[in-house]
């Protein structure tokens, strides 16, 4: 189990929309091992592979991928956050065949070598302007015949029924603000296929799964994740939140009431897209 004393962040990054003192906690709690394994199997992960986890965060996902490629597989996690890297190394980096590197996936990664399988999950949504360039850069790290797998959300945070009218009006404004101000991409999921197609990948395949699918009594981990999102929104889009009837307090109250209402329905589509690097490229 990860050490709870190390879950809080000691530093911030101006590049990451969701940065907060408790981001390590949020990432650890929200990652569903069973769902992740199902997604990785669809993507084609196999024992013995050399895997790159791009944007590995706290390393929990990297550790699960490491388990799936045994025996004889190895995995490398890369992230730009010193806080996340420190946590990942301490909690997941002590097993044979797993290592973590501080780095920027927008720059050359030749020092890491080539991989049979590259996993890019919940990363491109934070790089709306650079997403296609990141994919093309990662392609250089895929061995000919290897797989690049992109997984991300579409219509992020916007699929709910039946929201109070003020929430219905403000949520799209908040997401639009995040897109423009923080380089986020609310609709990146629908773009993944084109990223692989335009980057010259072959045998491209796409699947659609539910990421959030919340009905009836809400699970503690889902409530925690959404509450943290509200807190971040309040800080990053303060003017918008203050324009809500009743201000932040009413916004938070309305959203919390909606989340705990068992009649509520919330979902977020997850797009999975994989492609093979041709031997000719």
Predicted regions and their residues:
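N-terminal, positively charged/glycine-rich alpha-helical extensions of SAM-dependent methyltransferases
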Residues: 1-28
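C-terminal helical/coil "lid" or tail adjacent to the Rossmann-like core of SAM-dependent
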Residues: 13-17, 21-23, 207-265
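Conserved alpha-helix/loop element of class I SAM-dependent methyltransferases that forms part
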Residues: 30-49, 64
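Class I SAM-dependent methyltransferase SAM/SAH-binding core
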Residues: 52-54, 58-108, 133
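A short acidic, Gly/Pro-enriched loop at the edge of an enzyme's catalytic core
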Residues: 109-118
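Helix-to-beta-strand junctions that scaffold the AdoMet/dcAdoMet cofactor pocket
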Residues: 70, 127-128, 142-144
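A short glycine-rich, Lys/Arg-flanked "PGG" loop and its adjoining helix->strand segment in the class I
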Residues: 132-147
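Conserved catalytic/acceptor-binding region of the Class I
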Residues: 149-218
């Amino acid at each position: 189990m990860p050490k709870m004393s190390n879950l809080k962040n000691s530093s911030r990054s101006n590049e990451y929309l969701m940065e907060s003192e408790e981001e390590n906690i949020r990432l650890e709690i929200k990652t569903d091992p069973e769902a992740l394994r199902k997604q990785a199997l669809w993507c084609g992960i196999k024992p013995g592979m050399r895997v790159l986890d791009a944007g590995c965060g706290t390393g929990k996902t990297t550790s699960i991928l490491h388990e799936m490629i045994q025996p004889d597989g190895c995995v490398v996690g890369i992230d730009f956050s010193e806080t996340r890297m420190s946590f990942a190394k301490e909690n997941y980096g002590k097993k044979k065949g797993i290592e973590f590197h501080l780095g920027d996936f927008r720059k050359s990664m030749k020092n890491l070598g080539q991989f049979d399988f590259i996993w890019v999950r919940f990363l491109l949504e934070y790089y709306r302007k650079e997403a296609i360039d990141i994919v093309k850069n990662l392609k250089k790290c895929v061995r000919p015949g290897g797989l690049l797998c992109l997984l991300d959300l579409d219509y992020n945070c916007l699929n709910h029924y039946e929201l109070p009218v003020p929430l219905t009006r403000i949520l799209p404004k908040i997401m639009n603000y995040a897109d423009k101000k923080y380089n986020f991409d609310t609709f990146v999921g629908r773009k993944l296929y084109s990223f692989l197609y335009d980057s010259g990948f072959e045998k491209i395949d796409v699947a659609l799964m539910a990421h959030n699918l919340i009905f009836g009594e809400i699970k503690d981990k889902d409530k925690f994740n959404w509450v943290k999102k509200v807190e971040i929104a309040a800080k990053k889009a303060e003017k918008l939140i203050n324009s809500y009837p009743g201000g932040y307090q009413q916004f938070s109250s309305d959203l919390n009431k909606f989340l705990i209402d068992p009649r509520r329905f919330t979902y977020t589509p997850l797009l999975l897209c994989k492609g093979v690097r041709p031997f000719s490229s």
